[in-house]
From Swiss-Prot:
It comes from Oltmannsiellopsis viridis (Marine flagellate). The gene is rpl36. Keywords: Chloroplast, Plastid, Ribonucleoprotein, Ribosomal protein. It is found in: Plastid, Chloroplast. The lineage of its organism: Eukaryota, Viridiplantae, Chlorophyta, Ulvophyceae, Oltmannsiellopsidales. Pfam families: Ribosomal_L36. Belongs to the bacterial ribosomal protein bL36 family. Coiled coil: none annotated. One of its GO terms (molecular function) is structural constituent of ribosome. One of its GO terms (biological process) is translation. This is Large ribosomal subunit protein bL36c. GO terms for cellular component: chloroplast; ribonucleoprotein complex; ribosome.
Length: 37
């Protein structure tokens, strides 16, 4: 899980979602998991 100021999709499988007022990226590749913080 990477914590970044700006999250973006890295590949075509990445999905931008909002969870508990946090913007997150979930993906089939675990290296692409990100959260805004």
């Amino acid at each position: 899980m990477k914590v970044r100021a700006s999250v973006r999709k890295i590949c075509k499988d990445c999905r931008l979602i909002r969870r508990k007022r946090r913007v997150m990226v979930i993906c089939s590749n675990p290296k692409h998991k990100q959260r805004q913080g």
